[in-house]
């Protein structure tokens, strides 16, 4: 501590209140082909309505990926979604003669803004997809006598006609304002043709225009920063041409500038209908590289938290093996804090006479790992967006059941069985395995999804895909350790850069033991011990600037096999005499 050179009172505050923080363990992650939304940019979704708002309603091609995401959200409210597209995915636009642009996200836009302007485009749909073809941008300029505004069918969305902004007035310039409306011309977004999606009143065509609070009021800046539907690339010739004393849109304000239109249709609304947007037509089997690129966005655990990685729907066994084994590598080697959930490929279980044998063959190609959970089925559900029945992998619902287990019990409880393992919102299964078929599946590390009379459709197994006998061959144990490891690792950050002495070690133990006692009290652990003393922090360890703690845990085990012995005895037998006999 610092010493005073004269009498003084020194006040110090010392924080010894460290605890093991609570951590979430139910965030899902999925990659898919969607109709709308940013590409290769994880978006956290909380329910199906938000999924539609962010990624659009599905068509008959991407409905499988959409509903896989939607069915996970039936059980919980945290799903990281990454959209991927193929070469058919393109943004709708107006103007220009070059091929349709592909703008994936804001970063991509910032790199291509000037190029889009040079290509002669005025407005571009925010995201790739045919949905953008439904958009129209209407711009109301200043006009003499406000004739354009007066005759505009959308003028009731604005308080007054555009004129001269305060910024231009202060610089002796005039007529720089415009109103902008983005309209659902085709009705694809709202179901109503001509519905106004968003409005932007009193914008300026001057590139340096500011509002009273100092933020940009330039039409390009405002639309590109705030619009949910379009990018503004550049102006058409009516706006960008300098004619006489008229100043061109997109230039800075000079004294005497008049931005009023003098060419083209000067007293009417400018309408920019977008076209040529395209949807991806990819199936997963033919676009493995795209899907793997999407899942790569989940690799960095320091930047994004995921707990349940849902493998996508695939049509072939080869594609399934490639994707699943790549995801297991990410979970087990790269992140070490999540599990992968997968179902067999479509062709192995839907409309086939040998789904059990096929499922076993597919599962045998996967990496043996406690970070992988495999189920056996596909779910028949109703697609309300396209009025059809479809089959989707059970994996997303299996992951949802695991996430919901966290809420109704804890991560260290088994997600299987009638209490927590019920599947929601399904019409039927691709097939229901018999008892002997369930035995075959379970021996192969596959958790049966079965329709049991009187109980409904249940997850009827809680194995991981670890081939060797171990505590980690059960889902609840694997997830217990993931939660404990994540939480204690966060608490251990407070040890960094401290001294490796008795005080620091005692403080660490004092933080960790109450956390583990709580889990023991909640039935996740039968016993534990924390070793962090001079026995494992030897002088050699200390001299290497290291700190070691050994955390020994006896995990609770789920019941998989129940035996009920019914014993008939003579009338005169004392039950106490035979109660302890093994049967």
Region spans (language model):
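Structured, hydrophobic secondary-structure cores that serve as assembly/anchoring elements
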Residues: 1-110, 121-122, 126, 179, ...
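Extended, beta-strand-rich, solvent-exposed assembly scaffolds of outer structural proteins
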Residues: 51-55, 90, 100-211, 218, ...
């Amino acid at each position: 501590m610092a010493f005073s050179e004269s009498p003084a009172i020194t006040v110090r505050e010392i924080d010894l209140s460290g605890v093991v923080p609570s951590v979430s363990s139910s965030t899902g992650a999925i990659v898919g082909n969607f109709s709308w939304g940013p590409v290769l940019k994880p978006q956290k979704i909380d329910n199906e309505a938000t999924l539609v708002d962010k990624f659009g309603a599905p068509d008959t091609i991407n409905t499988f990926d959409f509903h896989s995401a939607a069915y996970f959200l039936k059980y919980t409210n945290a799903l990281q979604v990454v959209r991927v597209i193929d070469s058919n995915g393109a943004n709708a636009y107006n103007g220009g003669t070059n091929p349709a642009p592909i703008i994936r996200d804001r970063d991509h836009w910032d790199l291509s803004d000037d190029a889009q302007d040079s290509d002669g485009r005025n407005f571009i749909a925010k995201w790739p997809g045919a949905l953008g073809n439904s958009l129209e941008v209407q711009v109301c300029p200043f006009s003499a006598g406000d004739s354009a505004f007066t005759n505009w069918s959308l003028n009731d969305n604005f308080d007054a006609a555009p004129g001269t902004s305060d910024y231009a007035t202060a610089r002796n310039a005039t007529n720089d304002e415009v109103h902008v409306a983005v309209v659902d011309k085709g009705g694809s977004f709202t179901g109503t043709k001509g519905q106004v999606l968003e409005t932007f009143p009193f914008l300026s065509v001057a590139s340096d225009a500011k509002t009273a609070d100092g933020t940009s009021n330039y039409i390009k800046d405002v639309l590109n920063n705030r619009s949910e539907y379009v990018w503004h690339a550049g102006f058409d010739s009516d706006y960008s041409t300098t004619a006489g004393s008229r100043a061109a849109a997109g230039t800075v304000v000079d004294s005497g500038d008049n931005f009023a239109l003098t060419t083209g249709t000067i007293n009417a609304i400018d309408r920019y209908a977008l076209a040529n947007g395209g949807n991806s037509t990819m199936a997963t089997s033919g676009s493995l590289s795209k899907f793997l690129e999407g899942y790569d966005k989940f690799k960095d655990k320091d930047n994004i938290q995921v707990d349940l990685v849902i493998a996508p729907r695939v049509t072939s066994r080869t594609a399934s093996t490639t994707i699943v084994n790549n995801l297991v590598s990410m979970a087990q080697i790269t992140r070490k804090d999540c599990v992968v959930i997968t179902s067999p490929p479509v062709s192995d279980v839907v409309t086939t006479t040998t789904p059990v044998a096929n499922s076993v063959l597919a599962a045998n190609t996967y990496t043996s790992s406690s970070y992988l959970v495999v189920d056996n089925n596909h779910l028949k559900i109703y697609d309300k967006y396209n009025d059809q029945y479809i089959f989707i992998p059970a994996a997303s619902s299996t992951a949802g059941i695991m996430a919901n287990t966290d809420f109704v019990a804890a991560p260290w409880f088994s997600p299987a069985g009638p209490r927590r393992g019920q599947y929601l919102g399904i019409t039927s299964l691709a097939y229901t395995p018999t008892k002997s078929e369930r035995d075959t599946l379970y021996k192969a590390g596959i958790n049966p999804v079965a329709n049991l009379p009187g109980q409904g459709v249940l997850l009827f197994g809680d194995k991981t895909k670890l081939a060797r006998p171990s505590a980690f061959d059960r889902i609840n144990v694997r997830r217990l350790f993931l939660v404990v490891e994540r939480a204690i690792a966060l608490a251990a950050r407070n040890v960094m850069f401290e001294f490796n002495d008795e005080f620091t070690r005692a403080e660490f133990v004092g933080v960790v033991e109450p956390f583990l006692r709580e889990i023991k009290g909640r039935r996740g652990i039968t016993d534990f011990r924390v070793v962090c003393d001079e026995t494992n922090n030897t002088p050699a360890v200390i001299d290497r600037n290291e700190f070691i703690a050994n955390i020994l845990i006896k995990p609770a085990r789920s019941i998989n096999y129940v035996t009920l012995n019914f014993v008939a005895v003579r009338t005169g037998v004392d039950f106490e005499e035979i109660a302890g006999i093994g049967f």
